[in-house]
């Protein structure tokens, strides 16, 4: 492993960790940054799976007490049973649509221009959602009904379009469906666990031939970096949403998306995978 390859792994690990749980699209940022630093091919497919696992481990660690309480209480406690059922209900739409459409979406939509467009559109929707008057009827994740979970699960499917943001769609969807800001954010984190692990297992099996012993050091750098920066991002976001709205992320999405579109339109950057 040369120094530049290590630097690429470090950069992409940081990007994944910082963006995975913020409503700004980690997949979109990965596509853009990987394009800029010329990190692609079979190694990149396997590498992306590894750094996503690093990010999800950070959330598992951050919410380990809640997870342990649910696991211990699952046989007898109705609250734990309802929470688990809600996660399964919210998880299933992504499983069904992911298996059916994942390859098609990856082939046609994984490019810089799709990402930029989705960033802008998603940012506008976030601003609209934030400016609406919210009637909170669900204060905590334990108060959610199966209908709340199903609606959030359906909204999560929008994130199959790169640049949309899984966390952004589930959080904003939760707010529109009557969840408190804290409940919407926490449920988005919990839903990420089965969703991302399921996607990683599916992709890992599908691309199992791309995992090579020679790439272990690269994977290790990306995994550790992603874990550390995801932990920082999750803790920062939980503190941030206690006193702020998501408008700042919306404006960031719009500005970043427009910048990408401008560089493409004026030919300042030759995006390797750009499509009109």
Swiss-Prot record:
What protein am I looking at?
Undecaprenyl-diphosphatase
The GO terms this record gives for MF are: undecaprenyl-diphosphatase activity
Please tell me which top-level EC class this enzyme sits in: hydrolase
Name the Gene Ontology biological process terms: cell wall organization; peptidoglycan biosynthetic process; regulation of cell shape; response to antibiotic
Q: Does the keyword DNA-binding apply?
A: no
**What taxonomic lineage is listed for the species of origin?**
Bacteria, Pseudomonadati, Pseudomonadota, Gammaproteobacteria, Pseudomonadales
Q: What does this protein do?
A: Catalyzes the dephosphorylation of undecaprenyl diphosphate (UPP). Confers resistance to bacitracin.
- Give Gene Ontology CC terms: plasma membrane
**Main subcellular location:** membrane
- Membrane topology value: Multi-pass membrane protein
Q: What else is known?
A: Bacitracin is thought to be involved in the inhibition of peptidoglycan synthesis by sequestering undecaprenyl diphosphate, thereby reducing the pool of lipid carrier available.
Compartment(s) where it occurs, according to its Swiss-Prot or TrEMBL record: Cell inner membrane
Q: Where are the transmembrane segments?
A: 43-63, 85-105, 109-129, 183-203, 218-238, 254-274
EC annotation from Swiss-Prot or TrEMBL: 3.6.1.27
Q: What keywords tag this UniProt record?
A: Antibiotic resistance, Cell inner membrane, Cell membrane, Cell shape, Cell wall biogenesis/degradation, Hydrolase, Membrane, Peptidoglycan synthesis, Transmembrane, Transmembrane helix
Its recorded reaction(s) are: di-trans,octa-cis-undecaprenyl diphosphate + H2O = di-trans,octa-cis-undecaprenyl phosphate + phosphate + H(+)
Tell me what organism the protein belongs to. Answer: Pseudomonas syringae pv. tomato (strain ATCC BAA-871 / DC3000)
Q: Which gene encodes it?
A: uppP
Into which family does the record put it? Belongs to the UppP family.
Keyword Repeat, does the record have it?
no
Q: Which InterPro entries match?
A: UppP
Highest taxon of source: Bacteria
